[in-house]
């Protein structure tokens, strides 16, 4: 769990921190030499691997846009903008730039100058909390409805932002959804360097996307260290085991070729009886070009999950509501051992090419090919009992389902970036083009399963062979062209983005001999304004739009004529305040937002078509604080309130919560007999969540508060012979609170719930060099 921390800066790690560069002109004539050395000294933050989308060399093209700290004090903006032809480079050690993000603008921009809500989750924070999954990583962020599949649904990253499910990006490229939702890639969080949550519509730069935002992840890539590495072993409750290794350095003496290899072997039982997960993953990467103007990074990944827990739940009656027999235990399993299978193989190869033409213009392009194969088979409960009133009895109705899906995904994104002046205005221009393509083969099967006696369960019953009923071949592609202009005048920053997308899909179903075609063209845009006062305050306002293709048939004349559904349209108005204490990484953000999603499909009873008249509103307020006032103290806090309503039903959007709150802090003793000992803890509170309509009425999940704790110790402080060794431990849900994480209630059609994660403790020992 502490492997990442051992290789980084914060929390008293021993390894080399990121490198910061000082550009200092060399002059040789007269009195100008001393003056120039004072005026033109500039320092900027480097964010490779710590931004979700920007590659290593992007920092060189964006440096004169960012302010920072120097060893001698604050740097004036004019000096940071000035360039001398002959410069000498001096390396300076510094801390990770947790106050810089790239997802909002596709360039490395300080959060204090970003007119949109972005939550940054650093590698150090993930290590301090003992994070094992992306769901766990985002739990302390404002606006997140976490663990929508409870504590057992860990095979996918399932959470909502501002009431909406959001897509996931890795290294700037989208993980494409599969037609069934089962052949979806998952990234092991230990190979991640950083996670950003971009909140609100982002289609103006990324194409089809959710109005809630997106999740941006960044891989660990080669750094400028000559040789480094670490090995970490972790064990814990539910028979957790994992071994992680991360090794990198220079492949050539001059550093023109660099490498990094990450690998893991891990597994554990889940909190449900008779289920478990295993994973094998390796990710090699190479960077060619060193610190030159042209660099190429190649990144590969192969991951095999022979099993990955259960995807089942528990009936609402017996979990959220008391049944005639009482309540089901949290380890209740609704499936059957002989029919439980989840097998996923995923492979990917990525390239990132960057070229710097000069100090003003650069070009970058990246692409990824994914190949994902999933075999899934399960027996699951139907959400009700086979009894007269549905609330008594103990025989749980069940069915069986299976699918085999194979997806091939291509994604590319290329962009030119440049800086120009028009009078007093400074422009940061970007022109981009991206392309996505997918082919998916899927076969689905269905069958009956015997009822399960919940008081005396038999998990080895005879399950009949499944009957295939659907076989799809789906092909889709999206082309997008976009542009952006960040205009700066004194302390005012205006940003405008616009994009045109062309989307097509063709789905053929071979059992029913049907064909579904979609073709859409959509323009999306964003405009924002921010003013950065010199005392650290930045008020801002922004407006952004999004679109999402939908599958379905629509009629506006009672079924006389039919057409394919148009994409849903999202729009958001957001305003807020950001404050960063000058010269520190202490950042406070507050934002209010109003989101509308229109063109939502509304089904018409007893017909095969829908009306495209649905409208969803999401209104809320968020506050976050991220502070590292000292190198050995890290504090994060968040509060959010939201109201998400589906106008077609007059009810809240299902699985949308009313808000959350959290606080986490980690402190490392800097001196004394306990030097190197770190300890911390956190609280995360979830307000009520709407779970749909049950047979008895509206379902509301009660609020709950959970507590986590972490400790760590650098053994070098015990003995110099233990240099590089570190031990750590963490506990989630410290007091083992019994709670329901989420429910899906559809009246007589089924009522399901999911227990939240039980108390889960783990400990690790690691060595780094």
Kindly label every feature range from the protein language model:
Residues 429, 541, 573, 654-769:
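Conserved C-terminal beta-signal and adjacent last beta-strands/turns
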Residues 95-118, 123, 135-174, 193:
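Extracytoplasmic beta-strand/coil segments of soluble accessory domains associated
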Residues 491, 594-596, 612-693, 766:
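Gram-negative outer-membrane beta-barrel transporters
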Residues 266-270, 283-289, 293-356, 371-407, ...:
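Acidic/polar loop-and-plug regions of large Gram-negative outer-membrane beta-barrel proteins
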Residues 354-358, 362-368, 372-378, 539, ...:
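Membrane-embedded beta-barrel scaffold of Gram-negative outer-membrane proteins
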Residues 287-291, 407, 426-438, 472-597:
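Structural signature of Gram-negative outer-membrane beta-barrels, strongest in the C-terminal barrel
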Residues 158, 173-199, 218-219, 325:
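Short acidic/polar hinge/loop motifs at secondary-structure boundaries
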């Amino acid at each position: 769990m502490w492997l990442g921390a051992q290789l980084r800066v914060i929390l008293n790690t021993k390894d080399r921190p990121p490198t910061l560069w000082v550009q200092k002109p060399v002059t040789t004539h007269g009195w100008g030499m001393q003056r120039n050395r004072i005026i033109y000294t500039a320092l900027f933050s480097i964010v490779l691997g710590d931004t979700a989308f920007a590659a290593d060399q992007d920092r060189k093209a964006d440096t004169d846009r960012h302010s920072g700290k120097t060893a001698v004090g604050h740097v004036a903006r004019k000096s940071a903008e000035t360039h001398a032809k002959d410069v000498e480079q001096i390396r300076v050690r510094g801390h990770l730039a947790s106050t810089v993000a790239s997802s909002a603008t596709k360039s490395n921009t300080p959060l204090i100058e970003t007119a949109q809500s972005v939550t940054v989750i650093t590698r150090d924070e993930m290590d301090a909390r003992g994070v094992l999954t992306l769901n766990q990583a985002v739990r302390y962020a404002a606006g997140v409805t976490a663990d929508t599949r409870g504590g057992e649904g860990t095979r996918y990253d399932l959470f909502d932002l501002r009431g909406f499910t959001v897509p996931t990006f890795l290294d700037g490229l989208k993980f494409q959804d599969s037609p069934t939702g089962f052949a979806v890639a998952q990234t092991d969080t230990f190979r991640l360097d950083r996670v950003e949550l971009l909140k609100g519509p982002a289609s103006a730069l990324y194409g089809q996307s959710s109005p809630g935002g997106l999740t941006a992840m960044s891989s660990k890539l080669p750094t400028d260290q000559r040789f480094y590495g670490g090995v970490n072993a972790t064990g814990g409750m539910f028979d957790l085991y994992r071994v992680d290794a991360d090794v990198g350095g220079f492949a050539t003496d001059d550093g023109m070729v660099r490498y990094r290899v990450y690998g893991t072997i891990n597994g554990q039982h889940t909190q449900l009886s008779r289920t478990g997960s295993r994973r094998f993953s390796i990710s090699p990467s190479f960077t060619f070009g060193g610190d030159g103007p042209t660099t190429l990074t190649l990144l590969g990944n192969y991951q095999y999950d022979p099993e990955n827990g259960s995807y089942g739940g528990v009936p609402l009656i017996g979990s959220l509501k008391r049944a005639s027999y009482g309540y089901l235990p949290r380890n209740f399993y609704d499936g059957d051992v002989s029919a439980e299978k989840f097998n996923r193989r995923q492979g990917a190869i990525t390239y990132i090419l960057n070229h710097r033409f000069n100090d003003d213009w650069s070009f970058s392009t990246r692409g990824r090919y994914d190949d994902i194969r999933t075999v899934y088979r399960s027996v699951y409960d139907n959400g009700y009992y086979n009894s007269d009133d549905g609330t008594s009895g103990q025989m749980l109705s069940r069915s069986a389902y299976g699918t085999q899906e194979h997806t091939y995904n291509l994604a590319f994104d290329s962009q030119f970036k440049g800086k120009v002046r028009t009078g007093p205005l400074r422009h940061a221009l970007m022109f981009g083009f991206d392309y996505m393509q997918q082919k998916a083969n899927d076969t689905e099967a269905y069958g009956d399963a015997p009822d399960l006696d919940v008081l005396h369960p038999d998990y080895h019953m005879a399950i009949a062979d499944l009957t295939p009923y659907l076989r799809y071949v789906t092909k889709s592609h999206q082309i997008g062209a976009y542009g952006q202009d960040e205009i700066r005048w004194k302390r005012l920053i205006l940003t405008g983005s616009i994009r045109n997308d062309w989307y097509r899909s063709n789905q053929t179903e071979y059992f029913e001999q049907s064909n579904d075609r979609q073709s859409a063209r959509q323009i999306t845009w964003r405009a924002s304004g921010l003013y950065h006062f010199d005392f650290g305050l930045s008020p801002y306002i922004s407006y952004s739009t999004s679109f999402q293709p939908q599958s379905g048939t629509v009629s506006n004349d009672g079924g006389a004529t039919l057409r394919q559904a148009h994409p849903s349209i999202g729009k958001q108005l957001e305003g807020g305040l950001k404050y960063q204490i000058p010269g520190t990484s202490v950042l406070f953000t507050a934002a209010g937002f109003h989101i509308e999603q229109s063109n939502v499909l509304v089904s018409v009873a007893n017909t095969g078509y829908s009306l495209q008249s649905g409208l969803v509103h999401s209104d809320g307020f968020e506050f976050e604080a991220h502070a590292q006032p000292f190198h050995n103290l890290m504090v994060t806090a968040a509060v959010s309130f939201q109201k998400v309503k589906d106008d077609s039903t007059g009810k809240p959007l299902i699985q949308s919560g009313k808000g959350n709150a959290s606080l986490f802090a980690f402190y490392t003793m800097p001196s004394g007999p306990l030097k190197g000992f770190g300890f911390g803890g956190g609280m995360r509170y979830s307000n009520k969540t709407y779970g749909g309509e049950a047979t008895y009425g509206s379902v509301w999940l009660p609020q709950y508060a959970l507590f986590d704790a972490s400790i760590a110790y650098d053994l070098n402080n015990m003995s110099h012979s233990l240099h590089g060794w570190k031990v750590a431990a963490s506990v989630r849900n410290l007091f083992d609170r019994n709670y329901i994480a989420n429910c899906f209630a559809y009246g007589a059609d089924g009522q399901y719930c999911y227990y939240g994660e039980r108390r889960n403790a783990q400990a690790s020992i690691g060595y780094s060099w």
